[in-house]
């Protein structure tokens, strides 16, 4: 199962079960991220593009009370019973965020009145395209894990050329050869972000100087804790992820959909293309 923070694109707060309640009927709120399991949600496919969304702490699922069709109904957690009022669809907002729509009501999760405070109860409301209805799904893991990172467009993997150890070496795509220079450790740094370290060099993926510009080429660099070395994983909805810089809000991108070995990876504004999507395949 995949576990995520569900963060409002409007308020920056995350879905939260108040106090980690285990009760049926506990209302779900937005709250500042604090790392608790009551803010972690497991998305489990149930059918035809729908998911149940289960709290890691309570093992209860997001639920529209009584399957109501009304605007303004507050969302609760409840024991999984297989009802369509507990099934949710992820609809792309086109910016890396999603609308989360109930199968039963066709309403979406909504932060009432564009509120930004802690403790605001989440409601369902008819779709209107507002940012208070958009949610970022940020992959979370408790422990570091090692992956090869495969471009959806080219099938090539992220690679440190010849396993070089120096700072400033630019990261390329290359045919998978199983080398440690193609293995990447995703190490949680908090708030759903990771540093991404080469197994070969022990350097991390880095946006040079924290640049905000499109087309800046990605390098490896000694870990210094900067936000230009922190990355979040945003699901593309097909088992792949967009890998977004905390500093620039740009994503890893294969320039021009290039398919060849040796192409240097850049950052670019999100556009949803397969050249910005990456599959993470665990390696030993």
Where are these regions (language model features)?
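Low-complexity, intrinsically disordered Gly/Pro/Thr-rich segments
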Residues: 122, 263-267
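Extracellular glycan-recognition/adhesion modules and their associated mucin-like linkers
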Residues: 1-22, 40-69, 85-116, 134-165, ...
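Extracellular interaction modules
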Residues: 33-38, 81-85, 126-133, 177-181, ...
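A detector of tandem-repeat and repeat-rich interaction/domain scaffolds
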Residues: 29-30, 232
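A short beta-strand-loop micro-motif that forms or neighbors metal/cofactor-
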Residues: 72, 215, 262
């Amino acid at each position: 199962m995949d576990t995520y923070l569900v963060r409002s694109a409007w308020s920056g707060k995350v879905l939260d079960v108040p106090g980690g309640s285990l009760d049926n009927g506990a209302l779900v709120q937005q709250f500042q991220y604090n790392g608790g399991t009551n803010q972690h949600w497991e998305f489990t496919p149930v059918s035809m593009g729908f998911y149940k969304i289960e709290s890691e702490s309570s093992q209860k699922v997001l639920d529209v009370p009584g399957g109501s069709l009304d605007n303004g109904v507050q969302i609760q957690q409840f024991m999984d019973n297989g009802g369509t009022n507990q099934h949710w669809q992820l609809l792309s907002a086109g910016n890396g965020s999603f609308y989360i729509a109930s199968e039963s009501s066709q309403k979406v999760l909504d932060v009432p009145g564009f509120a930004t405070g802690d403790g605001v109860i989440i409601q369902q409301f008819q779709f209107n395209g507002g940012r208070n209805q958009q949610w970022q799904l940020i992959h979370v893991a408790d422990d570091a894990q090692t992956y090869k990172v495969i471009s959806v467009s080219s099938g090539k993997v992220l690679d440190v050329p010849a396993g070089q150890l120096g700072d400033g070496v630019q990261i390329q795509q290359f045919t998978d050869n199983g080398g440690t220079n193609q293995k990447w450790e995703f190490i949680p740094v908090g708030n759903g972000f990771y540093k991404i370290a080469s197994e070969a060099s022990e350097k991390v993926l880095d946006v040079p100087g924290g640049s905000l510009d499109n087309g800046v080429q990605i390098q490896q660099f000694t870990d210094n804790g900067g936000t230009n070395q922190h990355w979040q994983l945003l699901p593309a909805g097909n088992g792949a992820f967009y890998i977004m810089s905390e500093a620039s809000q740009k994503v890893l991108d294969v320039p021009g959909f290039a398919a060849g070995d040796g192409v240097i990876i850049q950052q670019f504004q999100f556009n949803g293309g397969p050249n910005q999507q990456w599959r993470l395949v665990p390696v030993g």
